[in-house]
């Protein structure tokens, strides 16, 4: 019998060795090495948490918050170090999305078979 958790652990280990993940780690190291980029990342991270919390609680963002996020996004878009990290992050998520499609394929096939019954 297959232990799917062993397979999942191996997949996690394999992910760490992919070109996409290694590029992300390198980009993160570049952010850490640049004080301004790191501070901007931390500000962006806090802002994203604030937005998610507002969405989860159904609260509207204030005009002041919206202006802050707009300004923050403009500063992030001008920071090439952070932009490189965000592009690398996107590549990792694309890879994970592709893997998720493969993992979900048996379930999709089972439901497709049920629909045909």
Swiss-Prot record:
Question: InterPro entries from the xrefs?
Answer: Com_YlbF, YheA/YmcA-like_dom_sf
Q: Which Pfam families match?
A: Com_YlbF
**Position of the signal peptide:** none
* Highest taxon above the source species: Bacteria
HAMAP family per record: UPF0342 (MF_01526)
Provide the family line.
Answer: Belongs to the UPF0342 family.
Q: What is this protein called?
A: UPF0342 protein Ldb1541
What does the organism's lineage look like at the top? Bacteria, Bacillati, Bacillota, Bacilli, Lactobacillales
């Amino acid at each position: 019998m297959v232990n799917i958790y062993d397979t999942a652990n191996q997949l996690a280990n394999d992910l760490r060795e992919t070109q996409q993940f290694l590029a992300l780690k390198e980009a993160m190291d570049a952010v850490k090495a640049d004080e301004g980029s790191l501070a901007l990342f931390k500000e962006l991270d806090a802002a994203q948490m604030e937005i998610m919390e507002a969405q989860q609680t159904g609260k509207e963002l204030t005009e002041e918050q919206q202006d802050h996020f707009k300004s923050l996004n403009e500063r992030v878009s001008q920071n090439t170090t952070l932009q490189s990290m965000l592009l690398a992050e996107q590549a990792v998520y694309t890879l994970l999305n592709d893997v998720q499609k493969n993992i979900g394929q048996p379930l999709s096939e089972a439901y497709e078979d049920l629909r045909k019954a």
